[in-house]
UniProtKB/Swiss-Prot annotation:
GO terms for cellular component: endomembrane system; membrane; mitochondrion; nuclear speck; nucleus. Highly expressed in heart, skeletal muscle and pancreas. Expressed at lower levels in brain. Also found in placenta, liver and kidney. The gene is FIBP. Keywords: Acetylation, Disease variant, Membrane, Nucleus. Binds to internalized FGF1; this interaction is increased in the presence of CSNKB, suggesting a possible cooperative interaction between CSNKB and FIBP in binding to FGF1. May be involved in mitogenic function of FGF1. May mediate with IER2 FGF-signaling in the establishment of laterality in the embryo. This is Acidic fibroblast growth factor intracellular-binding protein. GO terms for biological process: fibroblast growth factor receptor signaling pathway; platelet aggregation. InterPro entries: FIBP (IPR008614).
Amino acid sequence: MTSELDIFVGNTTLIDEDVYRLWLDGYSVTDAVALRVRSGILEQTGATAAVLQSDTMDHYRTFHMLERLLHAPPKLLHQLIFQIPPSRQALLIERYYAFDEAFVREVLGKKLSKGTKKDLDDISTKTGITLKSCRRQFDNFKRVFKVVEEMRGSLVDNIQQHFLLSDRLARDYAAIVFFANNRFETGKKKLQYLSFGDFAFCAELMIQNWTLGAVGEAPTDPDSQMDDMDMDLDKEFLQDLKELKVLVADKDLLDLHKSLVCTALRGKLGVFSEMEANFKNLSRGLVNVAAKLTHNKDVRDLFVDLVEKFVEPCRSDHWPLSDVRFFLNQYSASVHSLDGFRHQALWDRYMGTLRGCLLRLYHD
C-alpha cells in the first residue's frame, strides 16, 4: 500500500520595517546596529549583540537584492525569488519612493542631471540627510522622469501604472517631473517660505489647466510629434495670453474694471482703501505676468513674479487671506462685464489657475 503526500514549502521573506527605514535613510550596518541597540531592542528581545549584528546584516543583504526590483516595481510583483505578501510589497515600494521634504525642496525645478547630482554633497550637509539617502531620492526622481517623459496621457496615471505608487505619492512625483521639465525657479530667497506642498498644489492646477493635456484632445495621427500631453505647457495658450494685455493697455477698460471691482467690494474688504489705491498696479502685475509667458525665462520665473507682483504688495499692506480671496474672485469675475473685452475663455483659463495658486502662495 502506497501513501501520497502533498508537500508545500514556504519561505516568506521577513521584512523588519525599522531596519528598512534605517537602510533607506542611508545608515551603514554598524550605525544601524548602534541605533537599534539605543532603541532598547536587546532588552526587549533578550538577543545578544552578535545576533543583532547578524540580523541587521541579513536584512541589509535582502534589501540590496530587492533594490534592483524596486527600480521597476512591477518586476517585484511578478518575481518568484522573494515570497513577499502583496501588502508588504506595497509598503516596500511606497517607502522606497518616499522622499524628504527638505531634500525635494532643494532640487525642485532643477534639471535632473549629473550637474545637479554633483551638488548632493552640499545638500546632504545643509539638510542633515545622509548622502546615500540623497542619492536614492535623486535617482528615483530621475528614473521616474525618464520613464514618463515621452508618454502621452495623464502624468499621474502613467506614474501609477509604471511605479505602483499611491495616488498621493504619484501626484507628488507628477509635480516633481512637471517642475523639472519646465525648470521653474524655486530657489530664490524670496521663495524660501514656500513649501513643496505649495508648489505641488500649483503644479497640479497647471497640469489640469495649462498643459496640452488640459485641452482634452489627443492627436488622431499616432505618428504625430505632439508635445507630451501633461509634461509641457500649451505653447499656443501661452502665446494667446498676450491678448490679455488690453486689460491694462486700454485706459478705459482698466478704469471700468477697477470701477466694477470697487463697486462690488465696497464695505466688504477691511483693506478696501489699500485695494483701491493699488488696483492698477496689482492688475498690471497679474496681466503682465501672463503676457510674458511666451519667453522660457519668464516661464521659469513665474513664481518669483507672482510673489513680487502680488503677494509682497498685499502682504506689505497687511491684507488678510479672506480679503485676498474676495478680491481675486471679484477681479476675475468682473472681466465678464467688460463689453469691449473679447477673450473671456482665455481669461478664465488663465485666472482660474492663477487665483488658486495665489491663494496657496499667500501665507507667511
